[in-house]
């Protein structure tokens, strides 16, 4: 009986030591890590606002808030500036290939007729 209690106490002690070693060696600090400064977060936010359109920012906020997917979220943002070349004397419109204004996809083109 005494050996069982002794073994139990040894296991508890080793588990406690291992947990504390993991806590301090791996950086598990319950969110109190000083790795991110508020200035870095502000810079990142400003960069996102410069890169993403207002529609894309709203979609990102919607997803980060954990709201369910719907048609509004899955639909494309109207980020392209399309123009049509219409000759007043001609009723035909020609398709004009204009680049999308997204910064992530450099080969994105939209067509207007």
Swiss-Prot record:
GO process terms (BP): neuropeptide signaling pathway; positive regulation of heart contraction
Record field: compositional bias (Polar residues): 82-96
GO terms for MF: corazonin receptor binding; neuropeptide hormone activity
Record's signal peptide: 1-19
Coiled coil: none
Residue numbers of Asparagine amide PTMs: 30
Pyrrolidone carboxylic acid found at: 20
Keyword annotations of the record: Amidation, Cleavage on pair of basic residues, Neuropeptide, Pyrrolidone carboxylic acid, Secreted, Signal
UniProt note on tissues of expression: Four pairs of lateral neurosecretory cells in the brains of late instar larvae, pupae and adults.
GO cellular component, one term: extracellular region
Span list, region Disordered: 74-96
Function: Cardioactive peptide. Corazonin is probably involved in the physiological regulation of the heart beat.
UniProt similarity note: Belongs to the corazonin family.
Name of this chain's protein: Pro-corazonin
């Amino acid at each position: 009986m005494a050996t069982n209690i002794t073994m139990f106490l040894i296991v508890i002690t080793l588990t406690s030591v291992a947990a504390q070693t993991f806590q301090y060696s791996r950086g598990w600090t319950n969110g109190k890590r000083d790795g991110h400064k508020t200035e870095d977060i502000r810079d990142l936010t400003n960069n996102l606002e410069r890169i993403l359109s207002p529609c894309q920012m709203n979609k990102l906020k919607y997803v980060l808030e954990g709201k369910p997917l719907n048609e509004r979220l899955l639909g494309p943002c109207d980020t392209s500036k399309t123009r049509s070349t219409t000759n007043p004397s001609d009723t035909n419109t020609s398709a004009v290939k204009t680049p999308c204004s997204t910064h992530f996809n450099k080969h994105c083109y939209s067509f207007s007729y």
